[in-house]
């Protein structure tokens, strides 16, 4: 004959075993769950990584919320960047402090990958990040990328704010910036949401993702044949008041 023991939920750790009769006195990694009108001790579920992407810097703050469209969002601030987790990806949303257009201000040295940028009163410090693009190669070096997408290279997924961009050997890296121009609407995402500057998330050498403000209403591949300019991210290595240096991916010729 079996007798049911009516053990109530909760853990008592500061009484003797005798005084704690009918109560749990020692547990590990459990939770209490109501099943069939009774409370049962259940194993706490395991954990899994929210993303396989590593952060730059050390985490200093996290905030979770839902927007008016009931989209779950998480913002993470580190010593290096600010990220937002949206639709399965951590996007770098670190504000850009300042921007400038320079003319004939890039200096290179043959067989050297160090590039000097002449920028009066730039205000940068060693270790700062800059996003660069030069329209014309200097010493054989292009610090950014540019081109024109083939028709149908912008893909939408119904209900998603992520655009899939296909471009053979795009040359960009995650956290670089890309600006599109002359794109047309696709999958319910308007041209205005596409023709702006986006943070890049790289899938592979021929595919990248960008996040837009409007969710697609259908899955489609269109968008016309827009042009794009990609600003690649560099870390400042040496600075003085009016110049700074970065390291290119290859040596100048």
What positions do the PLM features span?
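N-terminal beta-propeller domains
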Residues: 1-99
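Small/polar beta-strand repeat architecture
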Residues: 14-19, 94-253
């Amino acid at each position: 004959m079996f007798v049911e023991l009516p053990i109530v939920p909760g853990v008592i750790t500061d009484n003797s075993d005798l005084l704690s009769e009918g109560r749990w006195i020692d547990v590990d990694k459990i939770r209490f769950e109501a099943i069939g009108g009774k409370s049962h001790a259940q194993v706490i579920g395991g954990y899994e990584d929210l993303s396989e992407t590593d952060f730059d810097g050390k985490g200093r703050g996290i905030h979770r919320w839902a927007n008016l469209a009931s989209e779950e969002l998480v913002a993470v601030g580190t010593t290096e960047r600010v990220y937002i987790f949206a639709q399965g990806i951590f996007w770098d949303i670190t504000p850009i402090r300042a921007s400038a257009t320079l003319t004939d201000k890039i200096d290179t040295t043959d067989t050297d990958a160090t590039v000097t940028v002449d920028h009066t009163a730039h205000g940068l410090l060693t270790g700062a990040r800059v996003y660069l693009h030069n329209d014309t190669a200097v010493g054989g070096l292009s610090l950014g990328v540019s081109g024109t997408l083939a028709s149908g290279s912008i893909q939408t997924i119904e209900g998603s704010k992520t655009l899939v961009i296909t471009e053979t050997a795009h040359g960009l890296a995650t956290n670089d910036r890309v600006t599109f121009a002359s794109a047309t609407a696709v999958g319910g995402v308007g041209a205005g949401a596409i023709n702006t500057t986006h943070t890049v998330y790289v899938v592979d050498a021929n595919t990248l993702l960008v996040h837009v403000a409007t969710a697609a209403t259908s899955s489609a591949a269109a968008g016309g044949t827009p042009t794009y300019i990609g600003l690649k991210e560099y870390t400042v290595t040496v600075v003085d008041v009016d110049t700074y240096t970065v390291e290119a991916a290859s040596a100048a010729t």
